[in-house]
Regions:
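Conserved N-terminal beta1-alpha1 strand-loop-helix module at the mouth
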Residues: 1-85, 90, 98-124, 151-163, ...
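Generic structural marker for isolated residues within well-ordered, non-membrane alpha-helices
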Residues: 93
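Histidine/lysine/aspartate-rich catalytic loop segments that bind and position anionic ligands
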Residues: 113-142
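CoA-thioester-processing core
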Residues: 135-136, 140-156
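Terminal recognition/anchoring or ligand-binding modules at protein termini
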Residues: 183
Length: 214
């Protein structure tokens, strides 16, 4: 398996809770060149989310970073994003494919049953988690641990669909998780211990380097 790559989730609520401007934070994250970024704006209006997506495209494209919208294929299309990420209670992958055939589609799963069902739908990637307990998401499912991740990796590899690991992954855990996933998705781990915007790029670059087991 090739070294895992970083899937950076730009969460509006997280940024606001830390006193960070979303676009300033995203600019520093993009400068570190993760493989993907996703905009997570659960409580924004559709118009605000669309505006943010368009701004993020301008930040991501120069670095050849894929941009995903969370939950909303309609906004992803309007903004010109690369794809959309849907959860268990969002539009099913099949409907997203019909309405937006050119969008890449990723889907969240939380256990073996959900993962198996998702793999049958042939999304562009499946996310599994939380791997560890997390405080970023208030209604998080039970953590599956490394054993659960190993099983998920076997199923995803057999289906030849990339696997994204998410949930409670920090610098100390990243390399162990990276041994079993194609991409590592994080929110709070993007922010350095200093909490300072000027330290974000170097911090994220270090995180990405830490994913390589060599």
């Amino acid at each position: 398996m090739a070294p895992a790559r970083l899937y950076a989730i730009i969460d509006v609520e997280f940024c606001e809770s830390r006193g960070l401007d979303v676009l300033d934070f995203a600019r520093e994250v993009c400068a570190a060149r993760p493989a993907c970024i996703q905009l997570r704006a659960k409580h924004n209006t559709p118009s605000d989310t669309l505006e943010l997506l368009r701004s993020l495209i301008a930040l991501a494209r120069p670095h050849e970073i894929q941009l995903y919208a969370n939950d909303r294929p309609d906004l992803a299309l309007l903004a010109g994003a690369d794809g959309v990420h849907v959860g268990q209670n969002d539009l099913p992958v099949s409907l997203v494919r019909k309405s937006a055939p050119n969008l890449r589609v990723g889907v969240s799963t939380h256990n073996e049953s959900q993962l198996s069902e998702a793999l049958e739908l042939r999304p562009d990637y499946v996310a599994i988690g939380p791997i560890y307990s997390t405080l970023t998401k208030q209604d998080a499912e039970p953590s599956i641990g490394i054993d659960g991740l190993v099983l998920a990796a076997q199923l995803a590899r057999a289906a030849r669909i990339p696997l994204v690991a998410i949930g409670g992954i920090d610098h100390s855990r990243a390399r162990q998780v990276a041994a079993h996933a194609d991409l590592i998705a994080v929110i709070s781990a993007l922010l350095p211990p200093s909490g300072r915007l000027q330290d974000v790029r170097a911090h994220v670059e270090e995180f990405i380097a830490n994913l390589d087991p060599s």
